[in-house]
């Protein structure tokens, strides 16, 4: 991994949009930290691409922070984060299951918030991005 190589963290990297995004960035020469629940798929991707495997369930807030800390310790810095974790469970109106709907919201909404919370201090304090920094 070179000093000038761009580095990215992508969640949901084991399938769908997240996998396609991870593979595209890897092919373009970025060093990719890929996260998803399915470690075995991430490990297979790591064999064929410039992707490092960081298993993670985004529903767990503490694990999001620990995973990002581990990525920073190994990558030194991160230039970009893309949070693609998501799940979908189509139902008809008479099949609505509140427990399943809560899980979908935990992954699709709160999972993103957990990841944003994990990276917010890093990106707000990232010196060379000070001029791009937003306000909260």
Segments (PLM) and residue ranges:
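Conserved glycine-rich cofactor-binding loop
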Residues: 14-15
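Substrate-binding pocket helix/loop in short-chain dehydrogenase/reductase
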Residues: 92-93, 97-105
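Rossmann-fold cofactor-recognition segment
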Residues: 48-62
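A short, exposed helix-loop element centered on a Lys and neighboring polar residues
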Residues: 116-117
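Conserved hydrophobic beta-strands of the Rossmann-like cofactor-binding core
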Residues: 7-10, 81-82
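Conserved glycine-rich Rossmann-like NAD(P)H-binding loop of the short-chain dehydrogenase/reductase
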Residues: 28-45
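Conserved NAD(P)H cofactor-binding loop of Rossmann-fold oxidoreductase domains
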Residues: 84-89
């Amino acid at each position: 991994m070179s000093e000038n190589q761009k580095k990215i963290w992508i969640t949901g990297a084991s399938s769908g949009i997240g996998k396609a995004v991870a593979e595209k960035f890897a092919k373009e020469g970025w060093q990719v930290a890929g996260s998803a629940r399915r470690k075995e798929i991430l490990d297979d991707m790591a064999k064929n691409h410039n992707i490092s495997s960081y298993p993670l369930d985004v529903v767990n807030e503490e694990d999001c922070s620990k995973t990002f800390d581990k990525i920073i310790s190994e990558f030194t810095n991160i230039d970009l984060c893309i949070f693609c974790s998501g799940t979908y469970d189509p139902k008809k109106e008479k099949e609505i299951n509140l427990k399943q709907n809560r899980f979908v919201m935990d992954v699709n909404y709160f999972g993103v918030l957990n990841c944003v919370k994990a990276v917010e201090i890093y990106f707000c304090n990232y010196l060379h991005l000070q001029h791009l920094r937003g306000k909260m």
